[in-house]
Amino acid sequence: MKLYNTLTKQKEEFVPLEEGKVKMYVCGPTVYNYIHIGNARPMIVFDTVRRYMEYKGYDVNYVSNFTDVDDKIIKKAIEEGTSAEEVSKRFITECKKDMADMNVKPATTHPLATQEIDGMIDMISKLIEKGYAYAAEDGTVYYRTRKFKDYGKLSHKNIDDLQAGHRDIKVTGELKEDALDFVLWKPKKEGEPYWKSPWCDGRPGWHIECSVMSKKYLGDEIDIHAGGEDLIFPHHENEIAQSEAANGVEFSKYWMHNAFLNIDNKKMSKSLGNFFTVREIGEKYDLQVLRFFMLSAHYRSPLNFSADLMEAAKNGLERIVTAAENIRHLRENAKVADLTGEEKTLLADSKAFTEKFETAMDDDFNTADAISAVFELVKFINTHVSADSSEAFLTALYDQMKSLCDVLGIIIEKEEEMLDAEIEALIEERQAARKEKNFQRADEIRDILLEKGIILKDTREGVQWKRA
């Protein structure tokens, strides 16, 4: 299995740090509004990478954070006359709902930046101790960028070229030593959330959050760090500088980045009126269509979103789902008998489609070619199944198809709705977990219910739930 490593600018054979295990960190959204379709691309792409790794037998520890303290969240809270915590909590719930509708699996861990402040203070203290950071007179802590000799290795930028492009960055009133130094900790402002620290009451900079959460949940060294290509510089470059200076080892072996999503060949922006949330797309299409559309191009290729392309994705998905429904229908009335000689030959032939699928995915997760292999399997199925097919033959083809679709996150059979009693039992377990302050288990149960389309609402009277 080969993947393209942004760090080396070439495809490399994937060799995990520990045999059979993958430690993967994906930068998650800043939760101040409903997620937009640009946010959805990395969610779907790297969920599919994870699914294929699991298909290949790897145990994947998948961590994806929520940035729940940020200028945009604070601005939204001020506009609404509420707290930053209330805004982020609400939109985390909404984000998880959208993720479930796109069939994005919950991460092994979804850490929140605000729950990891102590770790951030510890890492900043270590960087100061090692001479990689310094506190200014006003309590702001900066990273001493030039001290990290490998700065620019991910974005392939020369630090002197960066300096030339940032001559005006050191504005009046800033107390940093160098124009390229970036913020690790910033002093509080009136009305903003803040935490006590050795330098001042304040809050962390954005970059330190991911370095700390990755270290806590995955360790000093990880296999894969991923996100959108807009994060390569400065966010991921700064993460490397922080983590490698603090921990003394290479931060991530492989770096993966997805390309941008454009709308009708234009960059998505609110000012152009071509800005769409996942929720808005969900009003017109099943979000399985959005997922299928996102996987119809290679993740490193720019993807153009348009009504025509979404209709094409809808039609393509329907071809697959219809073939699956046809097999299920035939299987209900099929004769229970041994495979015929012809059926055995056909099943042997059908393995070529799985091989083609795996070859595509082994080549830097080429989902476009993998989908092509699924379509070939669908055509093969439509040609060779009939009312005379044996149950064993139909089951084998269905299982093959489902196995490939599961990797892509394409649902070809709707799960039966959970019974009310099952839901109530899980809610009771969640309440008990919260009483015991086992918030991780409580969040896991909320995620399980979200995946099943059950939305919880905590009220003074207790927990209310409804089906999505």
Question: Where are each of the predicted segments found?
Answer:
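Alpha-helical recognition segments enriched in aromatics with Gly/Pro capping
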Residues: 1-32, 47, 119-328
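N-terminal, positively charged nucleic-acid-binding surface of large information/translation enzymes
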Residues: 8-13, 17-105, 461-465
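Short phosphate-binding/catalytic loops that engage adenosine nucleotides
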Residues: 58, 132, 454
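Short, glycine/charge-rich beta-strand/loop segments that flank catalytic centers
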Residues: 66-70, 92-95, 105-120, 138-147
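Short Gly/Ser/Thr- and Asp/Glu-enriched loop/turn motifs at secondary-structure junctions
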Residues: 106, 136-138, 458-462
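Structural preference for alpha-helix termini/caps and helix-kink/transition segments
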Residues: 267, 274-468
